[in-house]
Structures are given as C-alpha cells and as structure tokens.
C-alpha cells in the first residue's frame, strides 16, 4: 500500500499543512506541487497520487497559508508573493527537499515563476507550468477578450460590475459562474473523485486580497506580477501544459513557450483549467515521461 505521510510545519506563528505521497526510489527526485488560487488547496492534486505508486516518485503537496488545513483569517498582510515564497523555501528546508521538480498550477505557476526568476533557488531539476501565466496584465486582458464570447447580457453584467466595483448583482454572479464553468471547471458530480467533492476551507480572503474579485480583474497584491522579461533567463527545463478552453489561453501558453529556452508545450485541446483532472491518465503519462527524462 502506498505510504502517505501528513504533517505541519511551523510558519510565522501558524501551521503549514503538508502531505507526502510515496517514497523516493533510486535517482527519482520528488515532485513538489503548488496549488492555485491564491486560496485554493492541495485537494485536487490528490488525483495524481497514483503517479507516486506507478513511478516510484515521491509527491509533496501542501496547503499554502490562508487556506485548507493551513487556514488563517484576518491577516491581509500575509497575502502576498513574498510570504508564499518564504513558505515554499522553508518547506523545502523543513522536509529536506534539496533537489526536486516543481509543478505549479494557475496561481501556483505564478508562485513558481516568481520563485525561479527572482530568488534563484538551487536544486530545481525541472518545472511544470500547468495552466498558468507570466504576467497579471496578460491574464486580465485575455479573460476580458474571452468574456466577449458570452451572451450579450452576461457581457453587460460583467462590464457593469467591473466599472462600479459592485459584484453583488445576481446577473453578474450568474455571468461569472457561466464563464468559470466554460473555462475553469464545473461543480464536481457525484461520481467525481472524493478529493474534488469533500468540504474544504477555501481562502477567499487570500484570493481577494492577493488577486482580486474575479479572474478578469487583478487588483490585489499580485496585480503587478510580471516576469515576461525574465523568461529567457530560465535555465531549468520547462514543460508547459494548457487546455484548449482554458483560462490560460493558447496565446498565454505559447507566449511562455516561445521565450523559455528549454521548453516544451503540451496542449490538451478539449480541456479547461484543470487538465490533470479532465485528462488524468494522459496527464500522468506526460508527467512520468517528463520527470524521468529530467532527473539527472
């Protein structure tokens, strides 16, 4: 039976929850998984657990401070890249992850790129940029472009809310939900994996303070995030993954692919924002091949 070890790391007077799946075998470096949000949790990454068993590779996932088992509230001073990067650095040290692969999904990819480009960490064997972005402005622009494919009344509701800053109108709530259903994910059905259905403490405060009120409007502490000028300096091999109907549009994914020197781009044509859920088997095979090719 696959070993799963859970624990907590003391961090800034709070506790960061982590979950380690499997054990390291041979020369296979562990894979650290950085979840999205900000304010989401590690839960959805549990659909990748069998990678540990099939590949003999340890997976390390954790709930970033502010959500899930690392829930903290009323601390807006914590919801910024500096704190989340410090948490990642301390977790690597705490768990002895001196050499590892990094996978960041959505906001987790922003965290990964900020860490790689501005903190020059050692021991990173490769990176996987899954449905992510190199700049907040680019994400916002692409979302607003895709909003134009919604019915006109939904476009109007989003435009009105964006202009007024009032996101409570039911028409806006319906429009935003439809947009996310088309490009992020829908509510998990009864036959979905348990990790996608079980109750979770999402860090809404972390999301709103860190990012903004919705995907179209980056107004938070991450609004000036932009590593576009540093992509050419990335030395680690990079696998870019995105979906054809993703919030991470093909334009965003190709922008990164064109600029990161040693990169490969895999487009899951029919997927939305969570390719690893929607095409789980194909995604795990892709990861296996990529990680084994980049362990040295």
Question: Across the structure, where does each feature detected by a protein language model lie?
Answer:
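Catalytic active-site module of serine/aspartate enzymes centered on a nucleophile-bearing elbow/loop
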Residues: 263-296
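Flexible "cap/lid" loop of the alpha/beta hydrolase fold
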Residues: 125-166
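Alpha/beta-hydrolase
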Residues: 148, 159-236, 255
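Active-site loop/oxyanion-hole signature of alpha/beta-hydrolase fold enzymes
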Residues: 61-107, 111
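Conserved loop-alpha-helix segment in the C-terminal half of the alpha/beta-hydrolase fold
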Residues: 221-271
């Amino acid at each position: 039976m696959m070993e799963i070890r859970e624990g907590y790391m003391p961090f800034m007077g709070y506790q960061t929850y982590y979950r380690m799946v499997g054990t390291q075998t041979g020369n296979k470096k562990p894979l650290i998984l950085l979840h999205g949000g900000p304010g989401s949790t590690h839960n959805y990454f549990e659909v990748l657990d069998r990678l540990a068993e099939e590949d003999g590779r340890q997976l390390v996932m954790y709930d970033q401070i502010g959500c899930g088992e690392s829930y903290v509230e009323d601390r807006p001073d914590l919801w910024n890249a500096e704190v989340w990067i410090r948490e990642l650095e301390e977790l690597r040290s705490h768990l002895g992850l001196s050499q590892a692969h990094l996978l960041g999904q959505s906001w987790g990819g922003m965290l990964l790129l900020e860490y790689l480009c501005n903190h020059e960490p050692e021991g990173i064997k490769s990176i996987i940029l899954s449905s992510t972005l190199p700049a907040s402005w680019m994400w916002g622009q692409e979302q607003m472009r895709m909003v134009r494919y919604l019915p006109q009344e939904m476009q109007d509701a989003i435009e009105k809310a964006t202009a007024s800053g009032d996101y409570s109108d039911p028409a806006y709530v319906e429009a935003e939900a439809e947009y996310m259903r088309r490009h992020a994910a829908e509510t998990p059905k009864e036959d979905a994996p348990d990790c996608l259905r079980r109750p979770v403490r999402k860090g809404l405060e972390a999301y709103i303070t860190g990012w903004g009120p919705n995907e179209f409007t980056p107004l938070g502490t991450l609004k000036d995030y932009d590593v576009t000028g540093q992509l050419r300096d990335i030395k680690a091999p990079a696998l870019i993954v995105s979906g054809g109907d993703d919030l991470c549009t093909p334009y965003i994914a190709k922008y990164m692919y064109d600029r990161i020197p040693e990169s490969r781009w895999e487009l899951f044509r029919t997927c939305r924002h969570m390719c690893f859920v929607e095409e789980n088997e194909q995604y795990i095979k892709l990861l296996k091949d990529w990680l084994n090719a980049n362990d040295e």
